[in-house]
Amino acid sequence: MNSEADLFRWGLRTPRAAAIAGILFSLLLTASMFLIRTSIPADPLAGATDVINHSKRIALALNMLPFAGISFLWFVGVLRDRVGKLEDRFFATVFFGSALLFLGMIFAAGAVAAGIIRLLGSGSLMGPGVYALGRIGIYQVMHLYAIRMAGVFMISTSTISLRTGIVPRWMAFLGFALALALLLSNGTINGLLLVFPLWVLSISVHILIDNSQGRPETAAGSSTE
């Protein structure tokens, strides 16, 4: 009996921990993007002088990305936990797929950026064409692919929210509007990707407050049964 009670209490604590992880993801990704934005010229064809001068700041930003990704996985976990037995296979597939693709995109961009920093810092010869190709590749991955995967994740999450009531309806409709902006983005608006971590932050704060006031019965029955 004691063992069952301990497992029950642990199950109630897990969503709260995941909600905090969503906040950590938002803070880490925002900080990483801010450091990169203030250290690297916006023009992907610009020279490497600023990159070399701010290599330590850029390295710090890149080291934040894996921890942001881990926190994002916990955030995905708490959303699924709140949906519980109401989970729909179709929307769950889009939900998981877009989340994993988004993480894959930012990790790939981070890996290429880390390689460029490593080569520039080691004194190895890197032609301007190779550097420009790396910069353009990173820019395209983040502003063409990752940003749209973030939009798809927001749409699937907002749709699930409307069907299950895991977050307020106004928050779901806000997610649709912001996702549309990400999907239609042509990459000319600097910092538009920051919309995604800020949206995750709002969802996580709501879940954290909701858990502190007592978990709702709707959509969460699978964790307590």
Predicted segments with their positions:
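Hydrophobic, aromatic-enriched alpha-helical segments typical of multi-pass transmembrane helices
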Residues: 1-225
